Amino acid sequence: PVYLLTGVVFFNFFTEATGMGMTAITSNAALIKKVYMPKYIYPISRLCSSLINLGMALLPLFIVMMFTGTAFGPSLLLLIFDILCMLGFVMGMMLLLSTAMTFFQDTQFLWSVVSMMWMYLTPVFYSDSIIPQNLLVYYHMNPMYQYITFARICIIDGISPEPIAYLWCILSSVIVLMLGIFVFKKGQDKFVMYL
């Protein structure tokens, strides 16, 4: 149960945050046209809301850990690192999606399909032990696989992940966040024309 719930909690945070962040600009069109404030405030506010929901979702996970006898060790503190990296990655995705949504209204429908496929390509409901060895390298390129696996190692195994896991988490977070900031900055001055 802990293995499954960990995957569900973390992936739900990803889908909820990106879904809310995608409409951060378009749903605030009237306000953006009337009042000037930095436009990145809108996606950030959505991220904060999703982060609160993540915190609330972690409580049932910890309760299940207690009932299943999963040890509460120092490795749980490493979840802070994992969540911080995931926040950077998710923020980058939100900036990319909110920009795309402003210019292309169909982004919302495309993303619903992409996010569902992404979920099936991430070991949320199944163990990564069933993944063929020749395909495992492609799974390692999936940031959500990295974040969820990192969390599972900390929670279930009660140990620190390998150093390469830290590197993967940081790289995917920084790269996607920087890309999101770049694209958002390039497009934000044109938002008003498309709202």
Predicted regions and their residues:
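Hydrophobic alpha-helical transmembrane segments of multi-pass membrane transport proteins
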Residues: 1-67, 109, 113, 119
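Short alpha-helical transmembrane interface motifs in multi-pass membrane proteins
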Residues: 2-3, 10-15, 44-45, 74-82, ...
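Transmembrane alpha-helical segments that form the membrane-embedded catalytic/substrate-channel core
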Residues: 9-21, 87-100, 120-129, 180-181
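Transmembrane helix-loop junction
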Residues: 33-34, 65-66, 99-103, 153, ...
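Alpha-helical transmembrane segments and their short interhelical loops
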Residues: 39, 45-114, 159-182
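Short hydrophobic, aromatic-rich alpha-helical segments embedded in or entering the lipid bilayer
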Residues: 120-167
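Short cytosolic juxtamembrane segments of multi-pass membrane proteins
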Residues: 188-195
